[in-house]
Amino acid sequence: MAEITAKLVKELREKSGAGVMDAKKALVETDGDIEKAIELLREKGMAKAAKKADRVAAEGLTGVYVNGNVAAVVEVNAETDFVAKNAQFVDLVNATAKVIAEGKPANNEEALALTMPSGETLEAAYVSATATIGEKISFRRFALIEKTDAQHFGAYQHNGGRIGVISVIEGGDEALAKQISMHIAAMKPTVLSYKELDEQFVKDELAQLNHAIDQDNESRAMVGKPALPHLKYGSKAQLTDAVVAQAEEDIKAELAAEGKPEKIWDKIIPGKMDRFMLDNTKVDQAYTLLAQVYIMDDSKTVEAYLESVNASVVEFARFEVGEGIEKAANDFESEVAATMAAALGQN
């Protein structure tokens, strides 16, 4: 039997990412043959990964990588936040973003077939990571964005990589593009413009806003405050020319009733119309980038600010770790606790 030296174990660990004991055991079983040991570890890793396949992985990181005129943002999941800080996991996320930006796959299936720096496919790399790290590690999704030479990428990660954003702007510069991405990270828009919002979605969100007003009015009534009116509209898509014209007529009637002289109406009406637009586009403000108040200049919306500097947003992608994933009640941490309790003979 070949001597299993510390140098041999170290070499296998560097090539496979396996732990010391797993590497030593594999070398013993393969009589010191590095290549056979790697294959054995891979087979065992696949078996371990298969056992973890049904677990919920809702923690993790995003990765962002810019490759010339192509940028990628990815989300990679683990079962616990602790593992998401592991250096091997971080390297895997960054390598994934890089190969996707360079390979430009059309979907997850094509992405999983890409070759990683290790020579493995992306899919095999995740199987290996699951085996060596000891948790389910999964590649969830990616977005690819391309730009022209005249446009600028804004790449930004927030909260230790839990949020990843890429934006493309026309005009301005890279610094402005990054500021826009910072805004996107903080304010969570889902689309660029109100034109992208579904009509039924707007109606449902408006109903939720009015329900919140009803609840607020109950509290106001208890302290003798007047009730707030319901919102009639939630999006610019609902503000037809007729609706806007009627709002202006209502304002004029209000000014007349207050006895305001007509010669000063032109100074008052624009401000009141701005207020009307603000009050009746709450859904837009929550979900559309251009309608949101810009965090770098709260006197303007994002759209107004960009217009003031002759710039525009072309496209953006925002990923937040775990969004849309329903965590099972019996997650990994609970499973560990249950296992420990069982070992101690507790219920």
Curated annotation (Swiss-Prot):
GO cellular component: cytoplasm
GO molecular function: translation elongation factor activity
Chief subcellular location: cytoplasm
Top-rank taxon: Bacteria
SUPFAM superfamilies for the chain: Elongation factor Ts (EF-Ts), dimerisation domain, UBA-like
A Pfam family assignment: EF_TS
Keywords annotated in UniProt: Cytoplasm, Elongation factor, Protein biosynthesis
Compartments where found: Cytoplasm
Residue segments, region Involved in Mg(2+) ion dislocation from EF-Tu: 80-83
NCBIfam families: tsf
Chain's role: Associates with the EF-Tu.GDP complex and induces the exchange of GDP to GTP. It remains bound to the aminoacyl-tRNA.EF-Tu.GTP complex up to the GTP hydrolysis stage on the ribosome.
Family: Belongs to the EF-Ts family.
Protein's name in the database: Elongation factor Ts
Species assigned in the record: Streptococcus gordonii (strain Challis / ATCC 35105 / BCRC 15272 / CH1 / DL1 / V288)
Record gene name: tsf
